[in-house]
Design a protein with these regions (language model features):
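Metallocofactor- and cofactor-centric catalytic cores in central/energy metabolism, strongly enriched
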Residues: 5-9, 23-210, 226-230, 248, ...
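Serine residues within intrinsically disordered or low-complexity segments
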Residues: 15-18
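Short, surface-exposed basic-aromatic patches at helix termini and helix-loop junctions that form
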Residues: 26, 205-213, 224-238, 254-263
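Structural motif
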Residues: 30, 163-166, 212-214, 237-238, ...
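Short, ordered loop/turn segments at secondary-structure junctions
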Residues: 170, 219-220, 244-245
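Short catalytic-loop micro-motif centered on adjacent basic/acidic residues
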Residues: 214-218, 240-243
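Conserved anion/nucleotide-ligand pocket segment
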Residues: 240-286
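Short beta-strand elements
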Residues: 291-300, 304-310
Length: 390
């Protein structure tokens, strides 16, 4: 475990140049990335590239919406037009890492962002240094307390009244210890350094203690415990979700809708998708692709074979979604939300355990996206009221 970066990056002009709904300009927001692997380095390099106006932030629902297409042609407007999100230029970027590293070296090592772009961003990325310091602590509770102190120092140094931690490190596939039903159970598990405590759970506890919102980019069974959502609720900060969705999830749902509209029955399907939580998984489906294969039943006993291949780097998609989740989480915090943010389930494979069991997420991804968009005006009004009261 390492100390947080306490150096503010060099900011570009921001991404608010064509936006209809302006955020809280001039108010710094801390964004601390845990892990400078493929996803973590892509988050930081992408933000720096976008706010330096070197690239357009394609892939981000908040910044780019439906890939530039007009709504009447199947596109969607950027979420930023519906609510006062923080500007990319107002993000103070930080990182945690196990060894001494910086965002420039991490981006070169990952190799997902083009070398020419990374070199052009070298001054900004070199400033984002994750301090080494896998510290010796008697228990993981003491470690969480130390990390929380680093987060407070980061916020104070950069003048950030709010912040979000985005954890990209892989978590537990399944729990091996007892379930955590309350914050008391969680702190007891941290004190005992039990098997049910993952690294992400330590960072989550630190974030809650320091007053930061939390986004778990990778799946982690430890973070699905009811105690985690309750901990963030008690700390008055939001907990976004666990395990960012890959685009193949949306593709499968779209294909299913087409098959339903054409009265084709799905007989069987095979997915060769690489698990997103594998930190070294550079691409979908083995070396260079994901392949989705299915068999659809047709008229008179016939069938159609459906095969879809997607080529690309999964970390770039997850980086864009992580930025979306962080900006939504910060907006929720500004609007006075805390605990499980089930309305953000459209971005995640697992919605955090809600306080109300009946508050189940919508069934389809489309319904969840509609719920997220419907929540934005409510958040915008609450954030505005909060700023006026302050």
């Amino acid at each position: 475990m390492a100390r947080a970066l306490q150096i503010r990056g060099t900011f570009g002009a921001g991404s608010e140049r064509s936006l209809g709904c302006k955020g809280a300009e001039g108010v710094m927001v801390g964004l601390v990335v845990v892990g400078l692997g493929d996803v973590g380095s892509s988050i930081l390099a992408g933000i720096e590239a976008a706010r330096a106006h070197l690239v357009h932030p394609w892939g981000s629902l908040v910044e780019a919406g439906g890939a530039g297409r007009k709504p009447e042609h199947g596109g969607s407007q950027p979420l930023r037009l519906a609510a006062p999100f923080a500007n990319l230029s107002d993000l103070a970027l930080g990182a945690f890492e196990l060894k001494e590293d910086d965002a420039y070296r991490a981006a070169l090592r990952a190799g997902h962002v083009s070398r020419s772009l990374v070199d052009e961003l070298r001054p900004q990325l070199r400033h984002i240094r994750a301090m080494s310091g896998a510290r010796q602590a008697p228990t993981r509770r003491h470690l969480a307390d130390a990390l929380a102190e680093d987060l407070r120092g980061f916020a104070e140094h950069n003048g950030c009244p709010r912040g979000v931690v985005v954890c990209t490190v892989p978590g537990l596939r399944e729990l091996s210890g007892k379930p955590l039903f309350s914050p008391v159970d969680l702190w007891d598990a941290l004190e005992a350094s039990g098997p049910e405590v993952s690294p992400a759970l330590v960072y989550a506890a630190a974030a809650a203690r320091a007053g930061y919102g939390f986004v778990a980019a990778a799946p982690d069974a430890a973070l699905e415990a009811p105690a985690v959502a309750e901990l963030f609720g008690n700390s008055d900060v939001p907990f976004a979700g666990v395990g960012l969705l890959s685009p193949d999830a949306a593709l499968r749902e779209a294909l299913q809708q087409v098959m339903d509209s054409e009265a084709l029955g799905l007989v069987g399907a095979t997915s060769l998708t690489t698990r997103a939580e594998e930190r070294g998984a550079r691409l979908w489906g083995g070396p260079d692709r994901t392949e989705e294969m299915g068999l659809a039943a047709a008229w008179a006993g016939g069938s159609f074979e459906i095969s879809v291949q997607m080529r690309g780097q999964i970390s770039l998609h997850h980086a864009a979604r992580a930025v979306d989740a962080a900006l939504l989480c910060e907006l929720a915090q500004r609007a006075g939300r805390s605990g499980a943010q089930t309305w953000m389930s459209a971005l995640f494979a697992t919605s955090p355990a809600a306080a109300s069991p009946h508050d189940a997420p919508a069934a389809t991804l489309r319904e969840r996206r509609e719920r997220l968009r419907a929540e934005l005006p409510v958040l915008a009004a609450a954030a505005l009221a909060s700023s006026q009261a302050a």
